[in-house]
Amino acid sequence: MSEMIYGIHAVQALLERAPERFQEVFILKGREDKRLLPLIHALESQGVVIQLANRQYLDEKSDGAVHQGIIARVKPGRQYQENDLPDLIALHDRPFLLILDGVTDPHNLGACLRSADAAGVHAVIVPKDRSAQLNATAKKVACGAAESVPLIRVTNLARTMRMLQEENIWIVGTAGEADHTLYQSKMPGRMALVMGAEGEGMRRLTREHCDELISIPMAGSVSSLNVSVATGICLFEAVRQRT
């Protein structure tokens, strides 16, 4: 069993963390890229089989996405399960979690993972039935974060949120109609931030299981932000409060 990843950052990140997962790598024939050459040398030093391929082959393997001239066939990584969450929480005095409810675009999932990694989030939680898959597109956008931030898929998000509350984790949800803003919130301790789908927001049951609702103040004419942008804003306000 194998999966495909593509893009310089995604391949580089996996090489640094788990070189044993590589099976073979395809490089665009004739491409001379100063960012690509050191990566090729590093792959070769690990004994990874590298093959030259034309653009049509790479485009087909990546479903027409921007692959930057490199695609790798790799062994699947660790799949975190719902029952891994208590152990992950126990590793930290102040767990910092991100919950994504209804983020179904892999580009947005990848961007949220990238922001989560940069902010020091310990795990990202998504529902099994309303979430994008962690596919090659999401991994490329994540720029390596998909290999460092545990992504946990849960069967029942509301039940998981209740479990988090039993672990004394404060759950902060984002909603446009919240009565106070992100900058009036208190997020210094054990917490989980909940982000809903762009436009739709959180589902009703998810909203009802939040301990606090906050909004991002908007000064312009647009009514909402892309979920990955909003996630970055909220995460780094939490980081500011936690440091």
UniProtKB/Swiss-Prot annotation:
- Cite the CDD domains for this sequence: SpoU-like_RlmB
**Record SUPFAM superfamilies:** alpha/beta knot, L30e-like
Principal EC category? transferase
User: What is a single cellular component term in the Gene Ontology annotation?
Assistant: cytosol
Q: Where does S-adenosyl-L-methionine bind?
A: G196, I216, L225
What is catalyzed by this enzyme? guanosine(2251) in 23S rRNA + S-adenosyl-L-methionine = 2'-O-methylguanosine(2251) in 23S rRNA + S-adenosyl-L-homocysteine + H(+)
Q: Which residues form a coiled coil?
A: none
What InterPro entries does the record tag this protein with? Answer: 23S_rRNA_MeTrfase_RlmB, Alpha/beta_knot_MTases, Ribosomal_eL30-like_sf, rRNA_MeTrfase_TrmH, SpoU_MeTrfase, SpoU_subst-bd, tRNA_m1G_MTases_N
Q: Which residues cross the membrane?
A: none
Q: Which UniProt keywords apply?
A: Cytoplasm, Methyltransferase, rRNA processing, S-adenosyl-L-methionine, Transferase
Recorded E.C. number(s)? 2.1.1.185
The name under which this protein is listed is: 23S rRNA (guanosine-2'-O-)-methyltransferase RlmB
In its UniProt entry, the species of origin is given as Salmonella typhimurium (strain LT2 / SGSC1412 / ATCC 700720)
Q: What is the lineage of its organism?
A: Bacteria, Pseudomonadati, Pseudomonadota, Gammaproteobacteria, Enterobacterales
